[in-house]
């Protein structure tokens, strides 16, 4: 029997289910709009989808509790209807969101897997054992790949800036201007500030391309310090960080939030050509989340050595996606440390080690790993956001 998408509004192509906290998404465009239904029944397989705007967190549930309870009440005796919450772009710690859904499931006595969550967060798969069906795929990664296909072989020019992807020969042939590259759009996050303070403390800030686009002082500066070796005394350098102000590499976010460089495709090729190593700071840095955004994958497409400061088991997850790590350069034992401060400390220790190896050692490492680096780039382009959406729709039908 053909699966249908239930829509609350006759004007469903313009007004989403759950508006205004939800919007129309790829599930609608790729399937739902061609298979709509406007009345619920207890026979046909029906999807009632809510594509959440922003993070899937407890606040969005609490703010719309009465409405959501009315939704669950309508399907409590109809196991053929699946309530789906989907988000392909935001996936930071979703545990409180799932806790709310479990309460709803129990209150309305819903069937196992009648609630479905479609998410970018790998860690959320743990909630399958609580009767919530979790469909996880690296959607943001796939979204990046589909954008990068346009510049895979041919660069484009934007006001004198080359937008394109670096290859291994260009990495080796390009004259380097800095050792590190690190994009840090939002430096209100403690772990990103700690990285920049660490670069300042160790005299590496001037040998790094560092973007700083969002700042504020709404946090406890004492959280910047730790007894861990690499993190000790970082707060002393906060004033220097504050004096830096904003630092724009290409996307002038402070003045133009919708600048062309906000588009995923617009990658400044020279940033990768001019540097030896990429320090990637992910969106989240948790031990109960595993949310990789496009940030973790750009280095593969640009043939650039890297280390990610992110959620626990981030690098392990990359391996599960078919990428090879650089074990002859980096000790990844920090990756599985549940203590966030210890994980950050040891990651910084590895970054220090990479810098101490020196330029010649990094180039030799690169030459010895060219086939691996090429293979990772090929693996990158084997993924596709559109295929992930098609596979998701198939899984919803099961």
Predicted regions and their residues:
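Pol beta-like nucleotidyltransferase catalytic core
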Residues: 2-280, 286-293, 300-398
